[in-house]
Amino acid sequence: MFATSGAVAAGKPYSCSECGKSFCYSSVLLRHERAHGGDGRFRCLECGERCARAADLRAHRRTHAGQTLYICSECGQSFRHSGRLDLHLGAHRQRCRTCPCRTCGRRFPHLPALLLHRRRQHLPERPRRCPLCARTFRQSALLFHQARAHPLGTTSDPAAPPHRCAQCPRAFRSGAGLRSHARIHVSRSPTRPRVSDAHQCGVCGKCFGKSSTLTRHLQTHSGEKPFKCPECGKGFLESATLVRHQRTHTGEKPYACGDCGRCFSESSTLLRHRRSHQGERPHACATCGKGFGQRSDLVVHQRIHTGEKPFACPECGRRFSDRSDLTKHRRTHTGEKPYRCELCGKRFTCVSNLNVHRRNHAGHKPHKCPECSKAFSVASKLALHRKTHLGERPAECAECGKCFSHSRSLSQHQRAHTRARTAAAVAIQSAVGTALVFEGPAEQEKPGFSVS
């Protein structure tokens, strides 16, 4: 039961008597010992399902009772499983650990980042004088000025960095800094001889500056994905990618926009969103001139002009211009609905539909009509509503020519035609059947009539 002194010193005092493996907690040891002796399973009295642990059985029984026992003490959000609550609380703890700047209120994830911010933004920086032209600059601007205004070989400053790059004007105070910088030129020029400490992949020949980067790259060849999601079992190459993926299950969005308050699950998504406030759209379409904040969005947009649909569904052959559209479409074949509302339990095929559904619970309707101030939770519903003000009726019925402002009303109208045709067919069939009943005996009385 109890481990050796070495295991105790390592913080694992509970040892398995069968294999000698040590654990930090007795509860973990008990679960491990069940793997040696019998199944030791726990059975649900309502449906007969068996669980490996008592905690799993309790979580399973809550699905019958519809309970949501685990409530976040910070924001009041409720969860069915304690594991999801732990992930959610980790986001609160991460935000609490951030270091705020007392001068401007900006927050940073750790103390070194805060100190660097204060040194760059709030502490008065002593100006540095260029020894060649006597102009004064900040430290970072001085290095840039010397590289541009005084090229290699023109400086006589004894305090200048002694290690200069042979490919560009940059200089470094240590040889290690120069060697690290030289990897940039190696990656940019494949014909240039590689530096001695470059790491090459034996499968595809690609080179990397660090062995750790090469190790991660080799996993792409082997297909190894060591970090598994406990909710859906999906594997990932890096733990950071797994953490971002788990936010799709918990609904956690720790990155908030300071301009409009909108929250995002990833910092990169927040940066792209902030460009919409700044009006920054550097990637323009050469065909129609529409601008985009990210190049990948431009590539997807250009497929509208070219008609390219490179992503095909293996089930039905339908093609799509965007991979994410294919992923959502394939769920219609599998019936998979991985995104679940934590308030009512309703499930959805994509996270965007879940976010729209959540607005119904919160009563949040951010899209307002400029004509009548009516608000909607989805922009598409606002677009349909505005057609009533503009008088647009682009959807025309092929049978009677009646026009409608949107296709949904046209579909409802066409069902009326279908019902009318069905009722007419039933009436005709009934009339024909009645006529046959009355004509049958009269025809049988005619001479020479026989029934086969």
Swiss-Prot record:
| Key word Hydrolase present | no
The record's subcellular location field reads: Nucleus
Question: Nucleus among the record's keywords?
Answer: yes
Provide the Gene Ontology terms for cellular component. Answer: nucleoplasm; nucleus
One of the record's GO molecular function terms: DNA-binding transcription factor activity, RNA polymerase II-specific
Matching entries from InterPro entries are given as: Znf_C2H2_sf, Znf_C2H2_type
Its GO biological process annotations read: regulation of transcription by RNA polymerase II
Tell me which residue ranges form C2H2-type zinc fingers: 14-36, 42-64, 70-92, 99-122, 128-150, 163-185, 199-221, 227-249, 255-277, 283-305, 311-333, 339-361, 367-389, 395-417
Give the range the annotation lists for the signal sequence: none
Specify where it is mainly localized: nucleus
Give the protein's function.
Answer: May be involved in transcriptional regulation.
Family recorded in the similarity comment: Belongs to the krueppel C2H2-type zinc-finger protein family.
Quote the protein name from its UniProt record. Answer: Zinc finger protein 672
Q: Which gene encodes it?
A: ZNF672
